[in-house]
Design a protein with these regions (language model features):
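Structural alpha/beta surface segment adjacent to cysteine/selenocysteine redox centers
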Residues: 16-115, 198-210
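Short pre-active-site segment immediately N-terminal to redox-active cysteine/selenocysteine motifs
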Residues: 10-11
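Short amphipathic alpha-helical segments at helix-loop
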Residues: 7, 47-51, 138
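C-terminal cap of thioredoxin/glutaredoxin-like
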Residues: 5, 14-31, 102, 110-210
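A short, charged/proline- and glycine-enriched loop
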Residues: 1-2
Length: 210
């Protein structure tokens, strides 16, 4: 059985779409998934980048694209009332609700759908209180231990060469994005073409640096 680490942030529409699409992408393959919520902003800061929603034209394109992708994949999808938003409360809630080391699929699904279905504000205080009551976290989301878990997960993601969300890590390789799901499936199937493209990337000489 193959083990997949799924790095995600609830702020990302692509992470939500990939979360919903993953079971449909891997039927018939023996695998297990560990869900690892991380702070996408931490990755961006580490690499000196702006988020997609922080660049005006890219923001507009992203929202159009994810709405289209949702319809193409048959996934219920609504933009929240405002985006981007601060996802820390949701990320900490996920880790606080983890009863066996990492959050399970139900926890992540519940939080993702809180954000990406219905079109309501993701960070509305009353909605967050209701979400917390629904998940009944075993730990206080505001506790130092929970904050540590989120920081540790983000640091571990960086150490694993994760640079964005959604990212799937398996067999020491990282697969980034919703559109990487077919390549991820090929890796799990043992398709030798994946080895070929991996080797090709390493053979390209570093060109101009800015």
């Amino acid at each position: 059985m193959k083990h997949i680490d799924f790095y995600l942030d609830f702020i990302s529409p692509y992470a939500y779409l990939a979360f919903e699409a993953l079971p449909r992408a891997l039927p018939g393959l023996s695998h297990e998934v560990t869900y690892r919520p991380i702070l996408f902003a931490g990755l961006l800061k580490h690499h000196g980048q702006l988020g997609p929603a922080e660049i005006g034209p890219k923001r507009d394109w992203t929202y159009r694209h994810v709405l289209w992708q949702g319809r193409e994949h048959g996934i219920a999808f609504d933009m929240p009332a405002a985006h981007p938003f601060n996802p820390l409360a949701l990320l900490r809630l996920a880790w606080a609700s983890a009863r066996q080391g990492t959050p399970n699929r139900y926890v992540c699904e519940t939080i993702f759908r809180h954000v990406w279905q219905g079109g309501a504000p993701a960070d509305d205080v009353a909605r967050l209180e209701a979400l917390t009551a629904q998940l009944a976290p075993a730990r206080d989301p505001a506790s130092d231990a929970v904050k540590h878990d989120l920081r540790a997960a983000t640091d571990a993601a960086l150490a694993a060469d994760v640079f964005g969300v959604p990212t799937f890590a398996v067999d020491g390789r990282v697969f980034w994005g919703l559109d990487a799901l077919p390549l991820l499936r090929a890796q799990l199937e043992g398709d030798t073409r994946v080895d070929e493209v991996w080797a090709c990337a390493a053979s390209v000489a570093q060109g101009v640096r800015r």
